[in-house]
């Protein structure tokens, strides 16, 4: 009788341990799933920013074509005249729980490219992630030739921070 009780106790302890391990494993899988969902939301947000930048560049190219000096108009549009409006349009992309920022509100010129960095933040179910991506817009292209927008606007250095 005592051996039966001891055997039953050992089996019960092993079962309780297994239940604890299964529960922990399920929690880890759930956290991993939620983390992956947040990651893809952020990547989707960066793609929305990219499409918004393409749209702005396309509109600016059309406006630049009717100006006397298209290249100067194009540069000034992003760097001086509509810089704040451009930043505002990027940061106001509405996606649930997604925050988009132009890093330091800085849009600058470097090596014939207009450059800026974007940070996307998301916090869902106590999981917080951020992604950063850099963008550059070429300024030395032929305005009269139909250049592919994907060659003018380049997204690079996308990484989790």
Model-predicted segments: where are they?
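Aliphatic-rich helix starts adjacent to a transmembrane/signal segment
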Residues: 2-41
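Conserved functional hotspots that engage anionic ligands or polymers and/or phospholipid headgroups
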Residues: 47-161
